[in-house]
Amino acid sequence: GMEVFDLYSGTGTIAQILAPAAEHVTGVEIVEEAVEAAKINAQRNGLTNCDFIAGDVLKVLDTLEERPDLIVLDPPRDGIHPKALPKIIKYGVDHMVYISCKPTSLARDLVVLQAGGYTAKRICCVDMFPATTGIETVCLLEKQKSADE
């Protein structure tokens, strides 16, 4: 079964969409009220394979014993903490989905992710907030296989 990490999980919307296809989903979110809402939402939706942890992604990653098969990233405007990126890359998952609300943060983080062996396979911009300057960008990242794999 698939273990999914949903980092910066908010109220758990993405985690709950992925839950039926996964064996287990772990959501990490710094806003405690959002984590409480995520737990209630999962319960209401009858999902028993979701765990939500309140805390900073940078610190929580050090405490997780599970090994993810897929990582979903949906960070705030400032993007992913520079010290968290190497920890995320180190998991070596085949695929990551990065959902960004600020293209410049995404561009900065992609440089690090690409240096860590990931390639952006597909990028899709979504105008979630018409008539504003805001744009959501969804990026599918794939781990590049080394010559001996």
Segment roles from a protein language model:
Residues 1-149:
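Rossmann-like S-adenosyl-L-methionine
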